[in-house]
Regions:
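Short basic, glycine-rich beta-strand/loop surfaces that mediate nucleic-acid
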Residues: 1
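FAD-binding subdomain of flavoenzyme oxidoreductases
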Residues: 5-160
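Short acidic (Asp/Glu) and glycine-rich catalytic loops that position anionic groups and cofactors
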Residues: 122-128, 180-187
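Active-site beta-loop-alpha junctions enriched in small/polar residues
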Residues: 162-164
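Short glycine/threonine-rich loop-to-helix capping motif typified by GTGT followed
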Residues: 168-179
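A conserved active-site cap/scaffold subdomain adjacent to cofactor or substrate pockets
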Residues: 182-198
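Conserved small/polar residues in nucleotide/adenosyl-binding loops
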Residues: 199-206
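Hydrophobic alpha-helical segments, chiefly the membrane-spanning helices
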Residues: 210-215
Length: 215
């Protein structure tokens, strides 16, 4: 809880080095002015630590495009149960020498070593984010839509499924928000550069709509 320092932000190399007690949101706040972000986005990002994210290989809605924590850590410093200090990984995106101990430690939930420092890989912030909400009268059509959407060239940045139980909770607070016969809903998000979203053929929006089941 005392290891809460952001050691360095290096936009030229798309890297931020932090101690494990730094909050996920603090990393986002520190890197956003440089035009970057750290993609892991668990629902607890406002109050979960980077060390906790690494220990569980946390992910969130954007894992569909960006993956989980394991894809966004370049290197670690840690102390093993025997009291040995180890350094894994490297400072660069391309690291092909030796055993990939970094990925081994990520998701180990503290059973292999205690993390003391993490070198995180940053990603450029998308300049445009767009969203579509789709309602379905049956689960099979919704499942078919998910398969079709994931086959598009423009991968969605988030794809969330809400079943009838979730929709009933929404109706309890906002009775007129959803069509009466809706039993499933998809919340679809795409991101990227303005040119990518506007001029890709077909556009992400048209591509998504074209892959929706006719029912």
């Amino acid at each position: 809880e005392r290891m809460t320092n952001i050691i360095s932000v290096d936009p030229a190399n798309r890297v931020v080095v932090v101690e494990p007690g730094v909050l996920n949101q603090s990393v986002q706040d520190a890197t956003k002015p440089f035009g970057f972000f750290w993609p892991p986005d668990p629902s607890s990002a406002m109050f979960s630590s980077v060390g906790g994210n690494i220990a569980t290989s946390a992910g969130g809605p954007h894992a569909v495009k960006y993956g989980t924590t394991r894809e966004h850590v370049l290197g670690l410093k840690a102390v093993t149960g025997a009291g040995n200090f180890i350094t894994t990984g490297c400072y660069t995106t391309k690291g092909v020498v030796g055993y990939d101990l970094t990925r081994l430690l990520i998701g180990s939930e503290g059973t292999l070593a205690v993390i003391t420092e993490a070198t995180l890989k940053l990603t450029a912030l998308p300049s445009v984010v767009a969203g579509i909400t789709a309602h379905f009268h049956d689960l099979s059509s919704c499942a078919e839509a998910i398969v079709n959407i994931m086959s598009l060239p423009q991968l969605p940045s988030a794809l969330e499924f809400l079943d009838s139980g979730s929709l009933n909770l929404i109706r309890g607070r906002h009775p007129d928000m959803l069509p009466v016969n809706t039993i499933a809903m998809l919340m679809i998000e795409v991101d990227g550069s303005k040119n990518c979203l506007l001029y890709t053929s077909p556009s992400p929006r048209d591509g998504l709509l074209s892959r929706m089941p006719s029912s």
